[in-house]
Amino acid sequence: MAFYSAGPLSPGYNSTSAWGGNDNAEEDPWAAPGSSSSAAPPTTSSGFAPSPPGGFASFSTQQQQQQQQQQQRQQAGYFGGAPAAGASLAQEADAYQDGLMETSFGVGSGAGQNRLGGAAATVNPQSPHNAHSSSSTYGSAISSTHSQPSTQSQQPQSHALPSSAAQAQAARAGAFPSGVSTSQYQPTSQGAQGASRFQSHTPSTLLPSEPAGFTSHTSSDYSATAPRQLAPGYPLPASNYTVPAYSPFARVDSLSTPRRETVEDMYGVPENFLEVEVRSPLTHGVGRKMYTDYEIVTRTNIPAFKLRYSSVRRRYSDFEYFRDILERESTRVNIPPLPGKVFTNRFTDEVIEARREGLERFLQVVAGHPLLQTGSKVMAAFLQDSGWSKDQWL
């Protein structure tokens, strides 16, 4: 966009300045050092020639003037006849006068001319010409106007980097503001260091097949042929790795060869056994004095019993006294109940058989209890003493 030009009646009118105002070069912040507004070249700070008083510059005129100014800057070496502010800063920053100082700010796209980048111009031949682009508002004179390519700007200067690799590095560095060092992001001349992309401490069964393009080109410790690891410091087992014949979690006695049992062991007498059987019910008496007794057969090798085999007869009333005595001797054991009494038809075969089964179940539970076997005195006598009497225990 072209700037408005101050008219003749405007205060501070100046025909040589598009901004108007002041002839004093020291008060003009956009003037070049060592020059005044009256002696300045016809180029203004906006990059366009001064417009005629009270009007606008045409598009074709500004385009021609812009091309002429671009050619003049290219022939002058940097930016024009007068020394630019960026060039003076470049001379002050180059303490060794070798033209190889580090980038500090605002590097332009012309990487081979000035790495300080005080006032470089952006050249893009593919883009259309933009005659309405304005200059930088901060005075670094970096113009975004796209112009035609020139052969002189592409020629290497006397202070350019000595090699094409250095020029490419400077061109890459120009894309970063404020001179950010990009050396850590640049590829090295050697092959990719380290292992390939799929070579890690992840178990190999979880990794996909490694493509041929990701193999390593260096002979480092983690080469492409190095075996994958399950964990750091723990390599994979050998291919001939075999499972041990025994499990480390098995019991010690199960590791030894099992001993074959003989016929005597299979059918012999157990170490501890106790068998109590109630059988052969008999009914005695006549009339009101009738009663039924039962035979108790005991087979055992437990030391608490004096006899290995015994056979005694007890009636139902004897069982009732025996249970009462057990409750008094062993308070810590719950004594099971006896089968209930029958008042009618108590001598029938069905009633007698049901009572026999109940009495046998009662004796098996009581005689098999470990506390009653070691702590009861009446149990062995009741099961094996043929002369047992309730009067001896009451």
From Swiss-Prot:
Its main location: cytoplasm. One of its GO terms (cellular component) is early endosome membrane. GO terms for biological process: endocytic recycling; late endosome to Golgi transport; protein transport. Residues 31-82, 131-178 have a biased composition (Low complexity). A 1,2-diacyl-sn-glycero-3-phospho-(1D-myo-inositol-3-phosphate) binds at residues 315, 317, 341, 346, 355. Pfam families: PX. It is a peripheral membrane protein. Residues 179-207 have a biased composition (Polar residues). GO terms for molecular function: phosphatidylinositol-3-phosphate binding. Residues 272-389 form the PX domain. PANTHER family: RE52028P. This is Sorting nexin-3. The gene is SNX3.
